[in-house]
From Swiss-Prot:
One of its GO terms (cellular component) is plasma membrane. One of its GO terms (biological process) is cell wall organization. It catalyses: di-trans,octa-cis-undecaprenyl diphosphate + H2O = di-trans,octa-cis-undecaprenyl phosphate + phosphate + H(+). It is found in: Cell inner membrane. Bacitracin is thought to be involved in the inhibition of peptidoglycan synthesis by sequestering undecaprenyl diphosphate, thereby reducing the pool of lipid carrier available. This is Undecaprenyl-diphosphatase. It is an enzyme of class 3 (hydrolase). It comes from the Bacteria. The chain crosses the membrane at residues 1-21, 39-59, 87-107, 111-131, 150-172, 187-207, 218-238, 244-264. Catalyzes the dephosphorylation of undecaprenyl diphosphate (UPP). Confers resistance to bacitracin. Belongs to the UppP family. InterPro entries: UppP. It comes from Pseudoalteromonas atlantica (strain T6c / ATCC BAA-1087).
Length: 266
């Protein structure tokens, strides 16, 4: 990989991991437009580590409160808001784990085409627009129940289909359940932690069993750039989402999907 490829791919990973615009749609663009080869498993692990560190550091206060509350009262009848939120993250993670193990082979075999990614980018983008426009948007993250957490988790399982966007579909589900935009985004970001961690561990196991030739300079640069871009993305998104809404991201997804379709049928 050249330095230009490392920089572009790491920044793409950091930004698209948390914006509702589909990371897989963007990661396929360099190969479609520029003919770049796959970045390799080791680099994929490195940029995911950068993204994971970014979200964990940004939400370190929330994570600390949730862990303290969960270990303190998570198994008692006197639940606190933070202990319940910890449970909701756990519950919402379970469907992705189940469907991830059950459907991984099928998805990798049949759902990673540019056509599938283009269609899901457009289709789930329109669903995001509908949720943002029609939902009540008046509930706080602490108003969630185990049922709403499970619904968001089921939605997250759909993100195994490339082009769906994990953050996009979980925010869509949160909005449809009546969460305000910031709460939907915060829960989506908290939910990303176990998912990215799990995906990173699986990729690491694959890497150990079939090791690539490792370019440590590329991995370090990729991880750092992914961390910086992901942290900035989370900060700016939460600062602006209540004011700008989801429409800019929906429009962007429509354009991106159309571009991919043009290349598919060109």
């Amino acid at each position: 990989m050249t330095l230009t490829e490392i920089i572009i791919l790491a920044i793409i990973q950091g930004i698209t991991e948390f914006l509702p615009i589909s990371s897989s749609a963007h990661l396929i663009l360099p190969s479609v437009l520029l003919g770049w080869e796959n970045q390799g498993l080791a680099f994929d692990v490195a940029v995911h580590v950068g993204s994971l560190l970014a979200v964990m550091i940004y939400f370190r206060g929330d994570i600390g409160r949730m862990l303290v509350a969960w270990f303190g009262s998570g198994f008692s009848k006197n639940q606190t808001d933070d202990s319940r939120l910890a449970w909701w993250v756990i519950i919402a993670t379970i469907p992705a784990l189940i469907f991830g193990f059950a459907g991984k082979a099928f998805i990798e075999e049949y759902a990673r085409s540019a056509l599938v990614i283009a269609c899901t980018t457009i289709g789930f983008g329109l669903l995001l627009w509908y949720a943002d426009k029609k939902a009540a948007l008046n509930k706080h993250i602490y108003d969630m129940t185990w049922k709403s957490a499970l619904i968001v988790g089921m939605a997250q399982a759909l993100a195994l289909i490339p082009g769906t966007s994990r953050s996009g579909i979980t925010m869509t589900a949160g909005l449809m359940l009546g969460l305000d935009r910031e709460s939907a985004a915060r829960f989506s970001f908290l939910l990303s932690i176990p998912v990215i961690l799990g995906a990173g561990l699986l990729a690491t196991l694959d890497l150990v069993s079939a090791p690539d030739a490792v370019d440590w300079n590329a991995l370090i640069v990729g991880a750092v750039l992914s961390f910086v871009s992901a942290y900035a993305c989370i900060y700016l998104f939460l600062a602006w989402i209540s004011r700008i809404g989801m429409l800019p991201f929906v429009i962007y997804r429509m354009l991106l999907g159309v571009i991919l379709l043009l290349f598919v049928f060109a």
